[in-house]
């Protein structure tokens, strides 16, 4: 029986490392799911802001990351597009030519900390399109966002 004493430690090391990997995998899956849900909600909020705020207002892109998602950079991952009546992106949007606003999150990589697996995964693109409303202009003049 004494000769088997080391075997239990080896078994525990193998099984324990697999269980820890499974535990970290569950935690990382929860964090990745939270990140995707937060970015989806942030995209919806930013599209709503884009519909009522002046064209190219910087507060639109910052609204996407309202939950503080780790590793997210609004300047590189958020694209705000102003669309015409046919849904084509406008190169130089003006108040009279914008019919829809579209906010999308692209190329965001979710960092992972699971030992032995990939260090990151790329999230799918989120895009929300809404009809343009006031675009920051009212009867009293322009309004700030």
Put a short name on every predicted segment.
Residues 1-66:
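Alpha-helical assembly-interface signal, strongest on the long, hydrophobic N-terminal helix that forms
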Residues 45-145:
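Short, conserved structural patches
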